[in-house]
Amino acid sequence: MAAKGISTIGAASRSLSSSLMAAAKEPDVENLRLIEELTSNVDAVQERVLAEILGRNADAEYLDKCGLDASDTDRATFRAKVPVASYDDLKPYVKRIANGDRSPILSTHPIIEFFTSSGTSAGERKLMPIVTDEMARREVLSSLATSVLNVYVPGLHTGKGLYFLFARSETKTPGGLTAQPALTSVYKSEHFKRAYAYTSPMAAILCEDASQSMYAQMLCGLCQRHDVLRVGAVFAAALVRAIRFLQLNWAQLAADIETGELNPRVTDPSDRECSRGDWTGIVTRLWPKTKCLNVVVTGVMAQYIPTLQYYSGGLPIVSGMYASSECFFGLNLRPLCGPSEVSYTIMPNTAYFEFLPVGEAVDASNLVELARVEDGREYEVVVTTYAGLNRYRVGDVLCVTGFHNAAPQFRFVRRQSVLLSIEADKTDEAELQRAVERASSALLRPRGASIVEYTSRACTERVPGHFSPALPHWTLAP
């Protein structure tokens, strides 16, 4: 179905999608049709999602305190009665659940585990409640991203992926619920095992010793080098770290493969290529059938783009999905775009989305619905989820870059709370990234050097502080 009044941008997107669907194969065709249906009816889908969330959580304590009952499933009542919330606002409720209170506090559906967010609150990791059907919801959206990539990069299903994936340790809350990173939960899921098409054995991925896990995954990837069609990790930093691990350990890896008496056609090229000392395009030299890299290169991960381009010999870098501990957000419908041009199309069936314009007061009346954001403006994303997060400030700042049908497309800008400061100044991660790029261009490139990665901290040892708002620490490569 197509929505009325779709812009010329939407019309162009429909035309592009039609050509993609003509080239697609089942079941990718059905997934592409679902994307078109969802993005053409954003407002109606969002209204349905909110009604579902409010209806199923009507008996939850949190919504009851807001003054909602089972009949209050419309947007107007929701906007009038439910306040914007931070993690500190929800923390007392989350703590009760973590301590074993099984009453319907945030959701009437049982909380089965917590995803630990990378953000912190008062030095503690944030705990995001997860209900039974959340993983299935994420699996559907992941399959949509796979279908989009299959059309742009055909034939990926005929080989394997060398993905450096690392599980983290889980903990138990006082009430006995598991608390772990979202990705660790994914790696342990039955869906992940069913859809498995990677060179790394599950035991290596789930190994909590990062060094042993890296060694085993690299070893298996080298042994299956002619089966690899894509190379990646979740974040760009992890893939760069894997290649640097190979630089330091290639001789031992080659020796282990040789000792294992594998086919010389597998072992010899790895040894020869790594011993040359030239690591330009090492990915395609070791894994010659690789079609793309698959990593997140948005936000602070953008610093690794030049390094990945160097190691891969210019392979396409795909950032396919945008998700967090709170929920799944959207897909990159142009996965082969330049890494600096990545935008994500929000999928309206995953949660109820609202947006706070950057610079405006944190007030419920200032929130803008998904279908009503403006092109070119920056917003902080606010979500209402099936698990009981209501009008929750995620902390991500996004910029609207266009539309696919009626669905807004967003570029990730920065985390709202990530700042460096000496006095009254405030330098966010996007500003720091631009400063480092300018310095690298002016000072390093003329000398044939480049930045592999960097970090920074506020420099307050001297008074007054440095004119620069941060003291950066750079790792350089010749």
UniProtKB/Swiss-Prot annotation:
Pfam families documented for this protein: GH3, GH3_M
Presence of keyword Signal: no
GO CC entries: cytoplasm
Molecular function via GO: acid-amino acid ligase activity
Enzyme Commission number, as recorded: 6.3.2.-
BP-aspect Gene Ontology terms: response to auxin; response to light stimulus
Family, similarity comment: Belongs to the IAA-amido conjugating enzyme family.
PANTHER family: GH3 DOMAIN-CONTAINING PROTEIN (PTHR31901), INDOLE-3-ACETIC ACID-AMIDO SYNTHETASE GH3.1-RELATED (PTHR31901:SF96)
Name of the molecule in the record: Putative indole-3-acetic acid-amido synthetase GH3.10
Organism: Oryza sativa subsp. japonica (Rice)
